[in-house]
Amino acid sequence: MENYPFDTTGLNTDTIDRFNKTYQALREEFKIEPTGHIDFDLHQFKAFRNCLDVNVRGSFVIKKDCGDSYILFVEVHFKIGEKHITHHQEFQVWGLTYLKNNFGGVVIRRETLTDKILELIHPHELDFDEDKPFSNTFYVVVNDHTKASSCMNRDFRNAVMDIRDNDFLIEIVDHTLIIGNYDPIIAEKSIHIAEFVERLAGAC
């Protein structure tokens, strides 16, 4: 029986293959190694707030001189429906890194037409007048405008702009940043996630 660097208990063959292909693709691009057990406290993030359970199936560190970043293989359980409730299970890949500065609470995602309309009625989005391309592309909600606007400098915004994927969510709680999406596991998307967190971790 093959040994995998992640927990395969109860996983079907397709999920194991997807995780393994992603791991192998990451190994080709980055110097990664398993972390062993670390509690990343994912329940603090709104991205997982509606989940009944969040289980890290595998965690891997990308080593840099200036700081480490992480790739997480995550299993989530949540409920769908109100009257007729069904339990749903998904497997996802998320990136995580620790930031030097305290950003407060921040959520960043691609801006939709609905966001633009709502912003006209109830303005609460953080915009950067000096960086219209960023503000026109991303929807940014924060709980502390002073912290977020000072920490989200040009280098940070450029890193977000350079992500080679359209469907992602970034969330920051104080010094901890995660990035991921709710799509099925795809190795190429995981590479884009890893590129972003490695870039932030390497910003001395």
What residue ranges belong to the model's regions?
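Charged, low-complexity intrinsically disordered regions
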Residues: 2-204
